[in-house]
């Protein structure tokens, strides 16, 4: 799931852009 990478980036920035 490519979203997994975005989720990792989201947690690092404190947001969830995958939404």
From Swiss-Prot:
Residues the record lists as binding FAD: 13
* Location relative to the cell: Plastid, Chloroplast stroma; Plastid, Chloroplast thylakoid membrane
InterPro entries from the entry?
A: FNR_nucleotide-bd
Query: Which GO terms label this protein's molecular function in UniProt?
Result: ferredoxin-NADP+ reductase activity
The record lists NADP(+) as bound by: 13
Q: Which GO terms describe its biological process?
A: photosynthesis
List the transmembrane segments: none
Question: What does the entry list under GO cellular component?
Answer: chloroplast stroma; chloroplast thylakoid membrane
Write down the EC number: 1.18.1.2
> Which Gene3D superfamilies does the record match to this protein?
Nucleotide-binding domain of ferredoxin-NADP reductase (FNR) module
Does the keyword Membrane feature in the UniProt annotation? Answer: yes
- How does this protein lie in the membrane? Peripheral membrane protein
What catalytic reaction does the record list?
2 reduced [2Fe-2S]-[ferredoxin] + NADP(+) + H(+) = 2 oxidized [2Fe-2S]-[ferredoxin] + NADPH
* This protein's pathway: Energy metabolism; photosynthesis
What this protein needs as a cofactor is: FAD
Which keywords are on file for this protein? Chloroplast, Electron transport, FAD, Flavoprotein, Membrane, NADP, Oxidoreductase, Photosynthesis, Plastid, Thylakoid, Transport
Could you tell me what this protein does?
A: May play a key role in regulating the relative amounts of cyclic and non-cyclic electron flow to meet the demands of the plant for ATP and reducing power.
- What family name appears in the similarity comment? Belongs to the ferredoxin--NADP reductase type 1 family.
Name the UniProt record assigns to this protein? Ferredoxin--NADP reductase, chloroplastic
Q: Which gene encodes it?
A: PETH
